A protein has these predicted regions:
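A conserved beta-strand-loop-helix scaffold within acyl/acetyltransferase catalytic domains
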Residues: 1-50
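Short loop segments at secondary-structure junctions
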Residues: 19-22, 54, 122-126
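Short acidic (Asp/Glu) patches
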Residues: 29-31, 64-68, 99-106
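A short, internal acetyl-CoA/4′-phosphopantetheine-binding micro-motif in the GNAT/acyltransferase core
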Residues: 46-56, 85-86
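Conserved acetyl-CoA pyrophosphate-binding loop and the N-cap/start of the following alpha-helix
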Residues: 55-67, 77
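Conserved active-site alpha-helix within GNAT-family acetyltransferase domains
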Residues: 74-79, 84-110
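C-terminal "cap" of GNAT-fold acetyltransferases
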Residues: 104-140
């Protein structure tokens, strides 16, 4: 990885699935303050989802995502976002493709486009909008 990364002002968690004393799967979860249609919104971002090959197709990733969603709800967060090339793995967890134009800073330059790998899950009663999503800063 190059660059200095970016600051995460909210809570951070690593969700692990254990097989005995070995990690068999994990995901990273953090909160991020963004603007959605110009209005402040705090949302959860999920990334780094990895499941060891010999325990795949056993619902391990689904249980990790359920745990991450529960943690976000506990913090009063209504939306979880992730970026994935293959949407099939996340649809069963309630994720749908995002249609939002997304603004962020990458390598010191402002980027703004619709990223077709973005997915969102509504964790409460509020509905997601297709308005501009401004990530308010750097991404990795």
């Amino acid at each position: 990885m190059q660059g200095e990364g970016y600051a995460i002002p909210g809570q951070v968690a690593l969700v692990l699935a254990m097989g005995g004393d070995h990690v068999v799967a994990h995901l990273a979860l953090y909160e991020r303050n963004v603007l959605l249609d110009g209005e402040p919104e705090r949302m959860g971002l999920i990334g780094g989802v990895v499941v060891r090959a010999d325990v795949r197709r056993q619902g391990v990733a689904s249980r990790l995502i359920e745990a991450a969603h529960a943690e976000l709800r506990r913090h009063g967060i209504d939306f979880a976002v992730l970026f994935a090339l293959d949407h099939r793995h996340y649809a069963s967890a309630g994720y749908v493709p995002m249609q939002n134009e997304t603004c962020f800073i990458e390598d010191g330059h402002v980027r703004r486009f619709v990223y077709r790998g973005g997915m969102v899950a509504a964790l409460g009663a509020r509905r997601w909008t297709t308005a501009l999503l401004d990530l308010q800063g750097e991404t990795v």
